[in-house]
Amino acid sequence: MKNTLNNELAVCGFAAVKTLEKANWERITRLYFSSARAPLFGGLCKKLAAAKKPYNQVKDEVELERLCGSVHHQGVVAMIQTPEIKALNTEITAKWVEEKQSAILLDRIGNANNLGAIVRSAAFFGIKNVVIPLDEAQSSVTTSSYRVAEGGMEFVNIYSIKSIPRLLNDMAGKMVRIGTSLDAKETTRSIKQMCQDKGVIIILGNEENGISKEVKSLCDHLVLIPYAGFPDAKPVIDSLNVAQASSVIMYELMGK
């Protein structure tokens, strides 16, 4: 939940706030917690006091719900300045190419929880770059995505772009562009072989419609996740949730 008056974003959830404390406590502008959580944030309160930043043990957890707009606060809410999503530029992508870094590109992922889960998986598998389009259908960083990321937001860079096709065109021959599709002929098991000793851009599509036809046409490879009995059997469910699928794909990409 955003506080537009103060340009703040509420970060809630124990793991998210604890990781924020360990990695970037200076970003916290205000802290609120329940009596049950108070013993776990004594050290942070001392730091905030030294920095002359307010903190408060609330009398009623309803106040935490009001601050973050959710009942899923887990007894703590930290306010931070609303994160600025940095625009992706050629200097950054040139570094990706040089260092053979990989990135996750989201094609209109509309659910904030899915964005958070994807960021969590990216952090777990050591992928530091997530790219989102400036599109009304694309979820941005919210209180919900922060909570679901379970601290992953502190370890992943999120960039914005105006045009997915333009980025994919710019990366042609420089990075391997791998999209996901239910009608793909290749599977995620071959991703390591597709890398060609280059960085990889994994494109994940919208929850309902997948990646667009134009984006598919700009991919070097299209892959799907093989199910039990592949290719002879058909699964009871056609596909995984996009966040679940992202974890499988990242495992195949980063696994030894």
Regions found by a protein language model. Name each.
Residues A15, T19, E26, F33, ...:
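RNA substrate-binding interface of SAM-dependent RNA methyltransferases
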Residues K18, T29, S144-A149, K213, ...:
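Structured adenosyl-cofactor binding patch, chiefly the S-adenosyl-L-methionine
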Residues L40, A137-S144, N209-L218:
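Short, glycine/polar-rich helix-capping loops at beta-to-alpha or helix-loop-helix junctions
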Residues P54-K59, Y159, I178, V223:
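General small-molecule cofactor/ligand-binding pocket signal
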Residues K59, D107, P133-L134, K162, ...:
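Short beta->alpha connector loops at strand-helix junctions that form conserved
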Residues H73-V76, R147-G151, C195-K198:
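Short, hinge-like loop/turn segments at secondary-structure boundaries
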Residues R177-D238:
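Active-site/ligand-binding-proximal alpha/beta "capping" segment
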